[in-house]
Amino acid sequence: MEFSVRAAELTTLLESRITNFYTNFQVDEIGRVVSVGDGIARVYGLNEIQAGEMVEFASGVKGIALNLENENVGIVVFGSDTAIKEGDLVKRTGSIVDVPAGKAMLGRVVDALGVPIDGRGALSDHERRRVEVKAPGIIERKSVHEPMQTGLKAVDSLVPIGRGQRELIIGDRQTGKTAIAIDTILNQKQMNSRATSESETLYCVYVAIGQKRSTVAQLVQILSEANALEYSILVAATASDPAPLQFLAPYSGCAMGEYFRDNGMHALIIYDDLSKQAVAYRQMSLLLRRPPGREAFPGDVFYLHSRLLERAAKRSDQTGAGSLTALPVIETQAGDVSAYIPTNVISITDGQICLETELFYRGIRPAINVGLSVSRVGSAAQLKAMKQVCGSLKLELAQYREVAAFAQFGSDLDAATQALLNRGARLTEVLKQPQYAPLPIEKQILVIYAAVNGFCDRMPLDKIPQYERDILTTIKPELLQSLKGGLTSERKIELEKFLKEKGGTYYI
């Protein structure tokens, strides 16, 4: 039987075939899971993969390639590995890990991959930034010269922090490390409300690493009650999250903070705490069979923290003059600051605030050891008035600590030593401060001026907090505001007259 096809039919058939011809083929490089366990998957067949590249498993779980070996690739899994089976397909994504960044992130709580976990829906307008980028070069930087005020008298007077600095907060558990960090965020509320331009506003990023979910929820509540969430981003990799997410969270938070730094704005990032990140990285490295070193940490644990903290910088005027200030937190064991991770981070940062359990239990809060705490670059950023006021403060406190140790052995002390002990006790009392009550810088200057110049010397110690509240509420607002501009001789006369009048009722 013969078939005859007319030319017109043939043309129509060919046209429809050509029209429906699909050319957009996608070629994926695929590997197979050889073994999986403890959050680590060994994959065979991904020969062209890059270090740090994201991959996707058949179950939809993502991972990152960390170990590139001859036979297979070591991949750490971002999530539960229970859905991954031997022989499953693994697909390259062709992209390095990135996270959302921008002002749309403000007020949100996200996980280490930038996915919102606060139940307020998806993120709106935002850009994406790589998690691992190089720190700014030498030419792009400028020396730190603007103050980053914490609202804490002990910090702003003795260990001042500048915008673009890295200041370590180190101490045992339950010594108030997180309290200092939270007070710093709360203090920016009044600073930002006074800001006249975007370049004066300071945005905050808080990275919670390995903390309890209840602790993070409590922090969100504190910040929202103080209306501080509107200029803050929270990145949470809690204790129940896999180690890879705890390892990644600081880098994700840093990428979000860098958006502000690179666009001529200012940001503060708090890593709470980097000890837990190092432990998570140690776990991953040992499971990837990398050789262990001191305290079983891998050899590149210094680089883990240095490449993160070097990204906090003050940019030059040519590159926008933005800044990223870092406050990393490290937890010590029984006050041992000579352990591996503490010494590493101390050597990377521009100074440290040391907190001690003994001071905390003696009621000196914040429990800052003034002798061990130091700020290597912050004094250049300190306000002129604060410099004038607290010039002798550190010396007097050092002399007080030295004499107080000897005073325990004998009571027959000369008048000069008695005066030194008396002044030191009052200075220590003045530097105490309740939690969640940061003070504006002009109020700090007033209180410290009163203590350093002997206006509290004749008062009982228990009356000093009351005296402090009294002078802060009754001083003329214009005199208080003028203190930020420096202490001229006229202002000093006016200030001393006011302090003498107020002090009379409190003297013994």
From Swiss-Prot:
<dbReference type="GO" id="GO:0015986">
    <property type="term" value="P:proton motive force-driven ATP synthesis"/>
</dbReference>
<keyword id="KW-0066">ATP synthesis</keyword>
<dbReference type="InterPro" id="IPR038376">
    <property type="entry name" value="ATP_synth_asu_C_sf"/>
</dbReference>
<comment type="subunit">
    <text>F-type ATPases have 2 components, CF(1) - the catalytic core - and CF(0) - the membrane proton channel. CF(1) has five subunits: alpha(3), beta(3), gamma(1), delta(1), epsilon(1). CF(0) has three main subunits: a, b and c.</text>
</comment>
<dbReference type="InterPro" id="IPR027417">
    <property type="entry name" value="P-loop_NTPase"/>
</dbReference>
<feature type="binding site">
    <location>
        <begin position="171"/>
        <end position="178"/>
    </location>
    <ligand>
        <name>ATP</name>
    </ligand>
</feature>
<dbReference type="InterPro" id="IPR000194">
    <property type="entry name" value="ATPase_F1/V1/A1_a/bsu_nucl-bd"/>
</dbReference>
<keyword id="KW-0547">Nucleotide-binding</keyword>
<keyword id="KW-0813">Transport</keyword>
<keyword id="KW-0406">Ion transport</keyword>
<keyword id="KW-0067">ATP-binding</keyword>
<keyword id="KW-0472">Membrane</keyword>
<comment type="similarity">
    <text>Belongs to the ATPase alpha/beta chains family.</text>
</comment>
<dbReference type="Pfam" id="PF00006">
    <property type="entry name" value="ATP-synt_ab"/>
</dbReference>
<keyword id="KW-0496">Mitochondrion</keyword>
<dbReference type="GO" id="GO:0046933">
    <property type="term" value="F:proton-transporting ATP synthase activity, rotational mechanism"/>
</dbReference>
<dbReference type="InterPro" id="IPR036121">
    <property type="entry name" value="ATPase_F1/V1/A1_a/bsu_N_sf"/>
</dbReference>
<dbReference type="InterPro" id="IPR033732">
    <property type="entry name" value="ATP_synth_F1_a_nt-bd_dom"/>
</dbReference>
<dbReference type="GO" id="GO:0005743">
    <property type="term" value="C:mitochondrial inner membrane"/>
</dbReference>
<comment type="function">
    <text>Mitochondrial membrane ATP synthase (F(1)F(0) ATP synthase or Complex V) produces ATP from ADP in the presence of a proton gradient across the membrane which is generated by electron transport complexes of the respiratory chain. F-type ATPases consist of two structural domains, F(1) - containing the extramembraneous catalytic core, and F(0) - containing the membrane proton channel, linked together by a central stalk and a peripheral stalk. During catalysis, ATP synthesis in the catalytic domain of F(1) is coupled via a rotary mechanism of the central stalk subunits to proton translocation.</text>
</comment>
<dbReference type="GO" id="GO:0043531">
    <property type="term" value="F:ADP binding"/>
</dbReference>
<keyword id="KW-0139">CF(1)</keyword>
<dbReference type="Pfam" id="PF02874">
    <property type="entry name" value="ATP-synt_ab_N"/>
</dbReference>
<feature type="site" description="Required for activity">
    <location>
        <position position="373"/>
    </location>
</feature>
<dbReference type="InterPro" id="IPR000793">
    <property type="entry name" value="ATP_synth_asu_C"/>
</dbReference>
<keyword id="KW-0999">Mitochondrion inner membrane</keyword>
<keyword id="KW-0375">Hydrogen ion transport</keyword>
<dbReference type="GO" id="GO:0005524">
    <property type="term" value="F:ATP binding"/>
</dbReference>
<dbReference type="InterPro" id="IPR005294">
    <property type="entry name" value="ATP_synth_F1_asu"/>
</dbReference>
<dbReference type="InterPro" id="IPR023366">
    <property type="entry name" value="ATP_synth_asu-like_sf"/>
</dbReference>
<dbReference type="GO" id="GO:0045259">
    <property type="term" value="C:proton-transporting ATP synthase complex"/>
</dbReference>
<dbReference type="InterPro" id="IPR020003">
    <property type="entry name" value="ATPase_a/bsu_AS"/>
</dbReference>
<dbReference type="Pfam" id="PF00306">
    <property type="entry name" value="ATP-synt_ab_C"/>
</dbReference>
<protein>
    <recommendedName>
        <fullName>ATP synthase subunit alpha, mitochondrial</fullName>
    </recommendedName>
</protein>
<dbReference type="InterPro" id="IPR004100">
    <property type="entry name" value="ATPase_F1/V1/A1_a/bsu_N"/>
</dbReference>
